[in-house]
């Protein structure tokens, strides 16, 4: 039986992770290690300045108090799940993680930590807040396929599912990340003492949503699978930077 470490960024009681856990437990051994509260947008934050406490629920699920998604996967792999998992799954997120969203996403970060620690990893997001059962069914189908025929790319699979009944899903597309215009909105309010409070506004509008992007696939009713990698090196820019450095006086005598 496949062993799955399951986490998220919406918190342990969120409907997405609970729906997915129920579906996965029909054919897998599942250990939930998830934040005790919503940590959306936490990205790859790792808690290094304080100790982490856990709460083990009656069903064996583990909530990490004030933990980030990355904390949860780190603890799950290195301390809390024994034997260790075969794969790390993050989700189901309430809302998509498309394009530049992956930079901020705690859902993607949890999967990224799993991959960084040497495990196959999936991040699963629903483009809405209704059909979690659809996203769970898609995830189960993919995991069963991975059991039959492992995918040895060393990459994270970022999966985004349209918020539709399963019967209306048109298929699956392998995509690239689209892009958004930079977000610029900030909302300012005042508390009762007259102190300013700031709220970060919505993400920027899409500007690269071409037919091969994750944006386009989900909008057209397809499941989007985007391979992501931990290595952030821009290999195609290395020669450009080398040439620039050779034509400047930066790398001279110190």
Curated annotation (Swiss-Prot):
InterPro entries: SurE, SurE-like_Pase/nucleotidase, SurE-like_sf. The keyword Signal does not apply. Gene3D superfamilies: Survival protein SurE-like phosphatase/nucleotidase. One of its GO terms (cellular component) is cytoplasm. The keyword Chaperone does not apply. Binds 1 divalent metal cation per subunit. Its EC number is 3.1.3.5, 3.1.3.6, 3.6.1.11. It is found in: Cytoplasm. It comes from the Bacteria. Its main location: cytoplasm. Keywords: Cytoplasm, Hydrolase, Metal-binding, Nucleotide-binding. It catalyses: a ribonucleoside 5'-phosphate + H2O = a ribonucleoside + phosphate; a ribonucleoside 3'-phosphate + H2O = a ribonucleoside + phosphate; [phosphate](n) + H2O = [phosphate](n-1) + phosphate + H(+). A divalent metal cation binds at residues 9-10, 40, 93. Its cofactor is a divalent metal cation. GO terms for molecular function: 3'-nucleotidase activity; 5'-nucleotidase activity; exopolyphosphatase activity; metal ion binding; nucleotide binding. Nucleotidase with a broad substrate specificity as it can dephosphorylate various ribo- and deoxyribonucleoside 5'-monophosphates and ribonucleoside 3'-monophosphates with highest affinity to 3'-AMP. Also hydrolyzes polyphosphate (exopolyphosphatase activity) with the preference for short-chain-length substrates (P20-25). Might be involved in the regulation of dNTP and NTP pools, and in the turnover of 3'-mononucleotides produced by numerous intracellular RNases (T1, T2, and F) during the degradation of various RNAs. Belongs to the SurE nucleotidase family. HAMAP family: SurE. This is 5'/3'-nucleotidase SurE. It comes from Yersinia pseudotuberculosis serotype O:1b (strain IP 31758).
